[in-house]
Amino acid sequence: MLIGSHVSPQDPLAAAQAEGAEVVQIFLGNPQSWKAPRPREDAAQLKAAALPIYVHAPYLINLASANNKVRIPSRKILQQTCDAAADIGAAAVIVHGGHVADDNDLDEGFQRWRKALDQLQTDVPVYLENTAGGEHAMARHFDTIARLWDVIGDTGIGFCLDTCHAWAAGEQLVHGVDRIKAVTGRIDLVHCNDSRDAAGSGRDRHANLGAGQIDPELLVAAVRAADAPIICETAEEGRKDDIAFLREKLNS
């Protein structure tokens, strides 16, 4: 089971070595911008590296939106991100589920997701990540994810489970792993994060493992059940300890 972290995109290989990471995740551009990722001078080096590199797509992406000024740029930047991810030999691109205006629009949101995936041209796998909060979200509650998966599951899309997000959404972590696997067939990646807030808060505020509200042993049980590569999206100070903690627990 590979264990690593979300690191600065400046030199991910050096960051991985410094943190003892066996796998990393990076942004390829500003996560709060619609601008396409710039070509990387080290693309060939990253592509040749043995280290698996995952790419997190910009937060602005909302493939479910009925608003053309949001949905169309979302499709464009996802395509550009996947193209840039292919250039570095990325293992996958992770994208949030987005949301619609009201619950009456959920089914239309699922169809917009389907259309976006049908139009996407890439050999890089794309993983949907569950989200912490937001009204009328595509991927906050597991029941809604199941409905979305009925529409998009046969496109080859994968799934990334974020423990902080599931906690914030009020989902049970270990039982939730079984529920998600029953829907998607597998979990492809885990974002193992503690939460600064109470269960069901809807707040997406990560904490280093053991420094938040989630029992560390519960996190260990969840990631063990998920049986997928692990990325710690926690504060840089303490992240090396997060990796070491998980490695000790999961290898014991």
From Swiss-Prot:
One of its GO terms (biological process) is base-excision repair. The lineage of its organism: Bacteria, Bacillati, Actinomycetota, Actinomycetes, Mycobacteriales. This is Probable endonuclease 4. InterPro entries: AP_endonuc_2 (IPR001719), AP_endonuc_F2_Zn_BS (IPR018246), Xyl_isomerase-like_sf (IPR036237), Xyl_isomerase-like_TIM-brl (IPR013022). CDD domains: AP2Ec. It catalyses: Endonucleolytic cleavage to 5'-phosphooligonucleotide end-products. The gene is nfo. It is an enzyme of class 3 (hydrolase). It holds the Pfam family AP_endonuc_2. Coiled coil: none annotated. It comes from Mycobacterium ulcerans (strain Agy99).
